UniProtKB/Swiss-Prot annotation:
Keywords: Cell membrane, Disulfide bond, G-protein coupled receptor, Glycoprotein, Membrane, Olfaction, Receptor, Sensory transduction, Transducer, Transmembrane, Transmembrane helix. The gene is Or4b13. One of its GO terms (molecular function) is G protein-coupled receptor activity. The chain crosses the membrane at residues 26-46, 56-76, 96-116, 142-162, 203-223, 237-257, 267-287. Disulfide bonds join C95-C187. InterPro entries: GPCR_Rhodpsn, GPCR_Rhodpsn_7TM, Olfact_rcpt, Olfactory_Receptors. It is a multi-pass membrane protein. Coiled coil: none annotated. This is Olfactory receptor 4B13. CDD domains: 7tmA_OR4A-like. It is found in: Cell membrane. Belongs to the G-protein coupled receptor 1 family. Residues 47-55, 117-141, 224-236, 288-305 are cytoplasmic.
Amino acid sequence: MANKNNVTELIFTGLFQDPEVQKVCFVLFLPVYLATLLGNSLILVAVSISKTLHSPMYFFLSSLSLVEICYSSTIVPKFITDLLAKVKTISLKGCLTQIFFSHFFGVVEVILLVVMAYDRYVAICKPLHYMNIMSRQVCHMLVAGSWLGGFIHSIIQIIITIPLPFCGPNVIDHYFCDLQQLFKLACTDTFMEGFIVMANSGLISIVSLFILVSSYAVILISLRKRSAEGRRKALSTCASHITVVILFFVPGAFIYMRPSSTFTEDKLVSVFYTVITPMLNPIVYTLRNTEMKNAIRMSWKQKDS
């Protein structure tokens, strides 16, 4: 077997095979993607122009919105245009690029969610020291660390993948470049590469989830000493973040804990976290947040004027 790349182009099977169903998906998912761009952009603008939103919590939220735009744009535009294409192709280099950036922005989002949980912990459990602990310099370092963590993770994934030989077949059973599906096309045994990739992603997920759960466990314990009104106010600031964490982690856990033979269901779940969740996050964060809603209204008024 020649240890070289004869494959320069890959073919996606897509989400569905029926052309009519694909057209319906195009009509549904295009507005969802546009809503993702609009909703997250509004949060970015609102946080940047509103003086009432110049706090660490909203700084992290605006950073999360930027990542949501980038992550969604890595996968969704190609997916949407492919819904109208008879043959869904991507170059091998393009596939590797998509893998790099999808893992990059995905891990940045995970770490940012952990940072936001820590921010809530400090705000609720150490309110008198909040501004000293969460200084502007610390906030910028935490966000920079999130981006650095995502970069290191993606570099590891891509360094493992690039040397693999691909000499055919060239069909990926997905609508975007998934590492596990790409490994199946390699003309060599990829057990070790697959193990390293899963360990890399799994370690980040487990550690992040542990910190998230621990942070909110400490918060809940500390709230036992508060009044009913104090508990209500504190929990209201955490509810949106907890919802977003659930939306992010549950679909991923569903995919990686199911047998590999149920891949059709996995593709449908992938639609949720690549297409739907980035649109829902701005809604979740603004639905019960009066300050954010007022800031967005002000940004619209300034735009109209």
